[in-house]
Amino acid sequence: MATKNNPSPKPMGTAQGDPGEAGTLPAPEAGIRDTGSTQLKAKPKKIRKIKALVIDLGSQYCKCGYAGEPRPTYFISSTVGKRSAEMAADAGDTFKETYVGHELLNMEASLKLVNPLKHGVVVDWDCIQNIWEYIFHTAMKILPEEHAVLVSDPPLSPTSNREKYAELMFETFGIPAMHVTSQALLSIYSYGKTSGLVVESGHGVSHVVPISEGDLLPGLPSRVDYAGCDLTNYLMQLLNEAGHKFSDDHLHIIEHIKKKCCYAALLPEEEMSLGLDELHVDYELPDGKVITIGQERFRCSEMLFKPSLVGSTQPGLPELTATCLDRCQGTGFKEEMAANVLLCGGCTMLDGFPERFQRELSLLCPGDSPTVAAAPERKTSVWTGGSILASLQAFQQLWVSKEEFEERGCAAIYSKC
């Protein structure tokens, strides 16, 4: 569901209004309560500004920070460590049951690692609560009841998600106001636009979402269940086939190799004909051993264009995008969408990906002349769009207050989000 009556966003740095404001709240000492028979003249209320937070919960990292800032302040792993019942019984009351963020780094006991999102959809709400508790109390060291919160929601996720977000925020954390809106909508705002075709590929899922004047075109958003984590796993497979010995325990190393050494080839067939001397790079492992990486550098990214390489029957990202463009024909928005294809998400940050994607999409849609844009900060496009939106003066009327939620329940969420 699109945010209703959203104001037009502007690129970061030109947002209207005071950054991060979410209206005002009376200070704790404001006024004197009437206790009954004695009538006391109330003191003038002191008004304090409250800074809004923006939280983008992704499959790999939860990105958070204050509205009005150009980039997130914190990147917190979306993985939660839980002790088993046996471990908890052995430890008694001396250890916590769940661990988030840096708490996972110094744990000697083995933990069950849980990711609360599967392909971008929340599957464990207890873990979401654990992550938010860590954000408020440990990372940011703030009182949640003093801050409005804007939360991003993946496209095509159940509408009940928004109700759960509201229940957690209002009932568990006591925040004064909140808003939930689509990740795709926030991504397009990061480009300073309200219309375009968002092609977003993060860690756990990829989406193609057409948006016109701030509204998601109904029935047209598409998704595929592959993204950056699948690319990482495929790179590990290719490296092992080349004689290396990596396991799931080394995925953080493979992730670093992907970011530092890999790319998408514009013409993969020509790249395959290059000699090792022209392709290879040396990479030093944490133990000091140096390995040589050759064709794996670009072969790993081919799975984004040919998902069959990793056993998926779903279409590649260019094909998914071309299909979505064709479906826009009947709505009259095809030309507008083709002129504004916007890449978002960390998986699209791979060197050479925008150029390769542009080439493949142009071959699939020769008559549409698609134009692909790739903003430098697109890895955090969802969060940045939220920061812009929550800073706009015209947006402040769209916050759902705690009082509204208590009076109207979920109807308050759906009337403004």
Curated annotation (Swiss-Prot):
InterPro entries named among the record's database cross-references? Actin (IPR004000), ATPase_NBD (IPR043129)
Region ranges (Disordered)? 1-39
SMART domains from the UniProt entry: ACTIN
Q: Cite the entry's keywords alphabetically.
A: Cytoplasm, Cytoskeleton, Phosphoprotein
Report the GO terms under cellular component: cytoplasm; cytoskeleton; nucleus
* Phosphoserine: residues carrying this PTM: S8
Cell compartments where the protein resides: Cytoplasm, Cytoskeleton
What the entry lists under SUPFAM superfamilies is as follows: Actin-like ATPase domain (SSF53067)
Principal subcellular localization: cytoplasm
Family classification: Belongs to the actin family.
Question: What PANTHER family does the record tag this protein with?
Answer: ACTIN
Q: What is this protein called?
A: Actin-like protein 7B
